[in-house]
């Protein structure tokens, strides 16, 4: 089936519904699998510092394949690329279920995720246009965060019951995403007929990086989203160690409940951003970014569950308001310069490089014995300072 690009720009067209459902199921699997695999590592007595290593092999796949996945997304119908990528995720989750080394299985899921991301965001610009793109991003983020909310909780709760059941549920979610991808209209490839010479692809990707970096707006977006997602992933792992130390709770479910509060907040923040921020007023999101770091610092000092829930929800609201406009800005400007697929691939490189760096520093801090509360305080302080510096730089340029 095919249809011309931009024929139906409704936020609830058939194609958009299929994208949102597929994204929900795929993201549900991603987040449930993380906590199910963390429970598996705990059950098999892996050291605590190995937990962030699990995410590092995942983002390492993003970085390794960054020069190629953008071109893949732009050279084929994006819905079919998403289906293939979810198939890889399904294979990775199934391999962990059948006893293959969890780091190897999770790496395969990372490869699928790397291929999936440019297609899932790039297709938004093909299904809707102009002012509706921010709203479409809001829908995508809301779907993603709802999946984070339910997937994280499901992964932790099912893992407390039986780790294998949790892992099987992840594989089932990926299978559902593959089916949903079938219903995405087969849109024309954005940039067909490109060279598949790996050297040329790498050179083309580096040219896309250079082009986006030289543009002040896209550079601003790249740095902002990279800082946010690097910090967000690190916070998830910090919670796993913070909960038993600060709250005295040792189950698998409580960290997932706390992560779910962040997810709920991001849904609210994403909705607010869609209503209050346009591509011309993106700088309105910057104070929210600074406050994220401040609230993380305050959160790290808590010892009661209810204040922890409230502060994490606030972090989520601020995060959703901060990141959605930056995503939309990059997609709109990137689509016109290097193609949406390449723009998102460059964004993934930045975000996952930031994740790798922050997780590496966090893992090292845990390995050398720094207590988790001082880690959280330092983490929040540095994030607030980094976003402040970015805002000052953006206003000057």
From Swiss-Prot:
Instruction: Locate the transmembrane regions by residue number.
Output: 18-38, 53-73, 91-111, 145-165, 167-187, 227-247, 257-277, 281-301, 305-325, 344-364, 367-387
Task: Tell me which CDD domains the record gives.
Answer: MFS_MefA_like
Q: Which GO terms describe its cellular component?
A: plasma membrane
Q: Which Gene3D superfamilies does UniProt cross-reference here?
A: MFS general substrate transporter like domains (1.20.1250.20)
Its main subcellular localisation, reduced to a broad class, is membrane
Instruction: Give the bilayer topology.
Output: Multi-pass membrane protein
- Per the record, what ranges lie on the membrane's Periplasmic side? 1-17, 74-90, 166, 248-256, 302-304, 365-366
Tell me the domain of life. Answer: Bacteria
Cytoplasmic face of the membrane:
39-52, 112-144, 188-226, 278-280, 326-343, 388-397
Q: Name one GO molecular function term.
A: lysophospholipid:sodium symporter activity
Where, subcellularly, is it found?
A: Cell inner membrane
Q: Which Pfam families match?
A: MFS_1
What InterPro entries does the entry give? LysoPLipid__transptr_LplT (IPR023727), MFS (IPR011701), MFS_trans_sf (IPR036259)
Q: Alphabetically list the UniProt keywords.
A: Cell inner membrane, Cell membrane, Lipid transport, Membrane, Transmembrane, Transmembrane helix, Transport
Function, as annotated, reads:
Catalyzes the facilitated diffusion of 2-acyl-glycero-3-phosphoethanolamine (2-acyl-GPE) into the cell.
User: Which HAMAP family does the UniProt entry name for this protein?
Assistant: MFS_LplT
Protein family (similarity comment): Belongs to the major facilitator superfamily. LplT (TC 2.A.1.42) family.
Q: What is this protein called?
A: Lysophospholipid transporter LplT
Q: Which gene encodes it?
A: lplT
């Amino acid at each position: 089936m095919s249809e011309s690009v931009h024929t139906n720009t409704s936020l609830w067209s058939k194609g958009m519904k299929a994208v949102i459902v597929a994204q929900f199921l795929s993201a549900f699997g991603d987040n449930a699998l993380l906590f199910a695999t963390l429970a598996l590592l705990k059950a098999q007595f892996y050291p605590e510092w190995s937990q962030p290593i699990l995410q590092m092999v995942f983002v390492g796949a993003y970085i390794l394949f960054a020069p190629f996945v953008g071109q893949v997304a732009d050279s084929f119908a994006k819905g079919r690329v998403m289906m293939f990528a979810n198939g890889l995720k399904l294979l990775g989750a199934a391999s962990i279920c059948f006893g293959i080394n969890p780091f190897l299985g999770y790496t395969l899921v990372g490869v699928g995720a790397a291929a999936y991301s440019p297609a899932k965001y790039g297709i938004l610009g093909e299904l809707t246009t102009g002012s509706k793109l921010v709203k479409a991003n809001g829908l995508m983020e809301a779907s993603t965060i709802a999946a984070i909310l339910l997937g994280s909780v499901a992964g932790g709760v099912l893992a407390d019951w039986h780790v294998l059941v949790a892992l099987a549920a992840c594989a089932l979610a990926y299978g559902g995403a593959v089916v949903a991808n079938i219903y995405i209209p087969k849109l024309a490839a954005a940039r067909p007929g490109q060279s598949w010479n790996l050297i040329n692809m790498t050179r083309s990707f580096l040219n896309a990086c250079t082009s986006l970096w030289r543009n002040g707006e896209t550079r601003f977006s790249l740095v902002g989203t990279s800082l946010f997602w690097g910090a967000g992933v690190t916070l998830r792992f910090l919670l796993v160690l913070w909960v038993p130390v600060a709250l005295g709770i040792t189950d698998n479910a409580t960290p997932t409940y706390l992560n779910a509060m962040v997810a709920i907040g991001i849904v609210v923040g994403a909705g607010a951003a869609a209503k209050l921020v346009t591509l011309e007023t993106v700088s309105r999101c910057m104070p929210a970014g600074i406050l994220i770091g401040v609230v993380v610092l305050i959160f790290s000092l808590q010892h009661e569950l209810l204040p922890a829930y409230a502060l994490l929800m606030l972090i989520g609201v601020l995060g959703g308001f901060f990141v959605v406009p930056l995503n939309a800005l990059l997609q709109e400007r990137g689509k016109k310069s290097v193609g949406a697929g390449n723009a998102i691939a460059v964004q993934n490189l930045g975000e996952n490089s930031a994740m790798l760096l922050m997780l590496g520093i966090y893992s090292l801090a845990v390995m050398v014995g720094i207590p988790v509360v001082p880690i959280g305080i330092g983490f929040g302080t540095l994030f607030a300072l980094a976003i402040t510096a970015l805002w000052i730089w953006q206003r000057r340029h």
